[in-house]
């Protein structure tokens, strides 16, 4: 029993250490201090170009997986493919914004969808590892992000670029059999980490 508790504690510590390293936020260029005094920042998401797992593009991944599911059961792959895309609006983005806005409460800044904000955050997904959960075997999700802070009136004018690599996603307790749940946790952690980073710069 003592050995089990010890091993479990080590595992939790290792996960925590891994998450801490993986969530490092790197400012590639520019300065986010322009957000000081702002009440809102517009937010947009870009999924136009990213790899998934061992696949170079999302299209390759979706075509392969949906074909495999359809072979097992007619229509299952099409349903799965739609769910994969719908998870962006239904799961990923709400999680990102919830944790980002919670982290920015002290500074009085809120991410919004609209045209009123002076600056816009463009959250670009660059790579997704969906992970898996099969019985007692599991692999957490991980997502790479490139986040541009631009002027809303002229989005070609980049104010800052922030990168986050291998942001982990998974639920403690192992109830994340759905890849969408695991990936959503990566977005939640990314939103929280971004808010923490910006807070320190304002």
Name these PLM-found stretches.
Residues 25-26, 108-157, 169-177:
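Surface-exposed short loop/turn segments
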Residues 95-106, 193-201:
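Structured segments of extracytoplasmic/periplasmic soluble domains
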Residues 46-49, 124-130, 164-165:
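Generic short beta-strand segments
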Residues 1-27:
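Bacterial Sec-dependent N-terminal signal peptides
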Residues 73-86, 153-200:
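Short secondary-structure boundary motifs at beta->alpha junctions and helix caps
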Residues 21-90, 94, 196-202:
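A structural "domain/chain start" motif
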Residues 5, 60-61, 139-142:
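Glycine-rich, phosphate-binding/catalytic loops in enzymes
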């Amino acid at each position: 029993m003592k050995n089990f508790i010890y091993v479990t504690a080590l595992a939790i510590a290792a996960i925590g250490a891994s998450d801490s390293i993986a969530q490092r936020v790197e400012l590639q260029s520019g300065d986010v201090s322009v957000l000081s005094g702002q009440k809102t920042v517009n937010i947009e998401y870009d999924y136009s170009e990213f790899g998934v797992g061992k696949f170079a593009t999302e299209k390759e991944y979706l075509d392969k997986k949906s074909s495999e599911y359809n072979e097992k059961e007619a229509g299952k792959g099409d349903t799965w493919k739609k769910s994969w895309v719908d998870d962006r609006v239904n799961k990923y983005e709400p999680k990102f914004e919830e944790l980002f806005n919670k982290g920015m409460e002290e500074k009085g800044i809120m991410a919004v969808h609209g045209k009123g904000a002076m600056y816009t955050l463009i959250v670009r997904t660059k790579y997704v590892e969906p992970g898996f959960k099969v019985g007692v075997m599991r692999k957490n999700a991980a997502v790479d992000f490139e986040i541009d802070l631009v002027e809303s009136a002229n989005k070609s004018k980049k104010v800052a670029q922030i990168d986050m690599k291998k942001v982990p996603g998974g639920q403690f307790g192992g109830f994340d059999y759905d890849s969408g749940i695991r990936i959503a946790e990566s977005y939640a952690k990314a939103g929280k980490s971004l808010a923490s980073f910006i807070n320190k710069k304002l």
